[in-house]
């Protein structure tokens, strides 16, 4: 499959993320999380670090029209896609450590799916989620486990590091269940429980390898100062060198095992 022209533009990553990753990768996890929370009619839901909003959208589908659902993200690009896909949801730009919730109304449910690991101030973000949650409300936070536990992401990172040097991949940087549990306890949550969950998802191999390489370049020290031409050259080289990973696929698709910690708690 050929990627459209915008695939080389990092500014267009939100469209790529929604088009090729949300459905096969993030929706199954959002559905698992929403099921775990046991939503009930009338629940107000806050999705923190919502990206293009898949957790909020799954919640809205369960609760129906008229439900109070708010999604918050720091990325205007992600929110632009979210608004285009689901205009009925209240999307707000803001950071997790200073949630834009001026109305002060608490939420029955707070979700943070694969966002916590990116927050510069995790205790402040956890405290903000605690304040946003109504007494007795339910929290769900998920973070990928270390990529050392998942063969394909680990191998793709090692390929990229041959060209970029060591990469601190934030996506997998908060995989210790004990750290996650302690963070939530310190923030004042009750009944904290962290479980390891796994899902095998089916992804378009070429697209996944390319998007993963784009993300790794962006997280590398050198990638932050590359010119567009240099970024494209390095991207093409990493994609080329990652080709052996595609040999395990069927019809161009890869079965990718994903592992995540899923923490639940109450306010």
Predicted regions and their residues:
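Short glycine-dipeptide loop
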Residues: 65, 133-139
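A short SAM/SAH-binding and catalytic strip from SAM-dependent methyltransferases
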Residues: 109-122, 145
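Conserved class I S-adenosyl-L-methionine
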Residues: 1-43, 54-58, 77-81, 85, ...
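A short acidic, Gly/Pro-enriched loop at the edge of an enzyme's catalytic core
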Residues: 97-110
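Conserved catalytic/acceptor-binding region of the Class I
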Residues: 123-124, 138-204, 223-227
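C-terminal helical/coil "lid" or tail adjacent to the Rossmann-like core of SAM-dependent
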Residues: 3-6, 11-16, 20, 26, ...
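Class I SAM-dependent methyltransferase SAM/SAH-binding core
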Residues: 44-100, 124
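Core SAM-dependent methyltransferase catalytic element
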Residues: 188-190, 212-213, 259-267
């Amino acid at each position: 499959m050929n990627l459209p022209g915008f695939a080389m533009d990092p500014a267009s990553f939100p469209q790529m993320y929604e088009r090729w990753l949300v459905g096969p990768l993030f929706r199954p996890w959002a559905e698992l999380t929403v099921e775990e929370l046991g939503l009930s009619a009338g629940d107000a839901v806050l999705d923190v670090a919502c990206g293009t909003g898949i957790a909020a959208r799954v919640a809205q589908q369960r609760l129906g029209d008229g439900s109070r659902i708010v999604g918050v993200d720091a990325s205007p690009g992600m929110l632009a896609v979210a608004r285009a896909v689901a205009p009925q949801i209240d999307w707000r730009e803001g950071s997790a450590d200073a949630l834009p919730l001026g109305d002060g109304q608490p939420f029955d449910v707070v979700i943070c799916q694969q966002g916590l690991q990116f927050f510069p101030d995790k205790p402040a973000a956890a405290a903000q989620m605690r304040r946003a949650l109504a007494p007795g409300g339910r929290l769900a936070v998920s973070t990928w486990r270390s990529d050392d536990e998942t063969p394909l992401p680990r191998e793709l990172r090692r390929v990229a590091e041959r060209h970029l040097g060591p990469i601190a991949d934030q996506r997998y940087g908060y995989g210790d269940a004990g750290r996650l549990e302690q963070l939530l306890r310190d923030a004042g949550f009750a009944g904290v429980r962290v479980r390891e969950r796994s899902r095998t998802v089916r992804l378009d191999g070429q697209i996944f390898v390319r998007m993963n390489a784009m993300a790794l370049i962006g997280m590398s020290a050198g990638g932050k100062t590359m010119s567009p031409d240099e970024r494209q050259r390095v991207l093409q080289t990493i994609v080329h060198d990652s080709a052996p990973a595609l040999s395990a696929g069927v019809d161009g698709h890869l079965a990718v095992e994903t592992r995540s910690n899923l923490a639940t708690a109450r306010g």
